[in-house]
């Protein structure tokens, strides 16, 4: 279990919180593994009805940890933990609610295409700088995003790298409700508790129907992952990452 993932229970709600604020909740392989385990363990617990995924104040997640990315790009690691997390999210029988305040970058954005209800603050920002790093979309976003928000808006988000504010994300269908920052966690919990009061089998079936074919979605994730992996090891991506790290270093 990663020290940066906090798992707790409130009634029938399984709460999974990212807590690596000093790195803006950038996700390491250990964090992915811990989240996958937390979701899978609670998903087979009859006392749990809903999963709730949270970040911190002003930060949901900055996306993948760049150190892990660089290790994979240099050919030393494979990073299967992220796919285990995707699989756990997609195959969860119980609904997943997310609460977002502040930045949601890369997979910090695409995760919400695989959740059921996302509550966010107006100051939240959803962005996917994949192409700027020589990469391509992931987590089934290449198909789910155009269905959810239309090709133009999805292409602007996933290819152009255009950020969506909290309200713009709500209008696009990525977010269900906008609340004030001080109300985010209480509203997210209240929503999860409302869901938890529903008949559990009916609730699980409803999620299954609305998610569609889980195998097909995971197959899509794996196709995206193969392309993502090829890109990650490409000269183009290595140069883009190096330029990014140089810019970051120059800013101190």
Task: Label the predicted regions.
Residues 1-56:
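Conserved CoA-thioester-binding segment of acyl-CoA-metabolizing enzymes
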Residues 88-203, 234, 239:
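Crotonase-fold acyl-CoA enzyme core
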């Amino acid at each position: 279990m990663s020290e940066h993932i906090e798992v707790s229970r409130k009634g029938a709600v399984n709460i999974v919180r990212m807590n690596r604020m000093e790195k803006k909740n950038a996700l390491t392989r250990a964090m992915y593994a811990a989240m996958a385990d937390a979701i899978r363990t609670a998903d087979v617990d009859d006392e749990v009805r809903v999963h709730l995924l949270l970040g911190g104040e002003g930060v949901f997640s900055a996306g993948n940890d760049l150190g892990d990315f660089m290790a994979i790009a240099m050919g030393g690691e494979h990073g299967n933990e992220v796919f285990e997390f995707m699989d756990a999210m997609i195959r969860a029988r119980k609904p997943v609610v997310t609460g977002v305040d502040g930045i949601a970058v890369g997979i910090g954005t695409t995760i919400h295409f695989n959740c059921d209800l996302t509550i966010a603050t107006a100051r939240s920002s959803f962005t996917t700088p994949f192409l700027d790093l020589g990469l391509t979309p992931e987590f089934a976003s290449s198909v789910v995003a155009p269905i959810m928000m239309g090709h133009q808006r999805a292409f602007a988000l996933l290819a152009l790298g255009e950020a969506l504010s909290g309200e713009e994300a709500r209008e696009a269908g990525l977010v269900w409700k906008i609340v004030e920052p001080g109300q985010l966690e209480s509203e997210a919990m209240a929503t999860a508790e409302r869901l938890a009061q529903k008949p559990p089998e009916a609730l699980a079936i409803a999620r299954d129907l609305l998610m569609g074919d889980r195998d097909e979605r995971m197959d899509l994730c794996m196709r995206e992952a193969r392309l993502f992996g090829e890109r990650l090891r490409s000269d183009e991506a290595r140069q883009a990452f190096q330029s990014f790290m140089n810019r970051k270093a120059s800013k101190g």
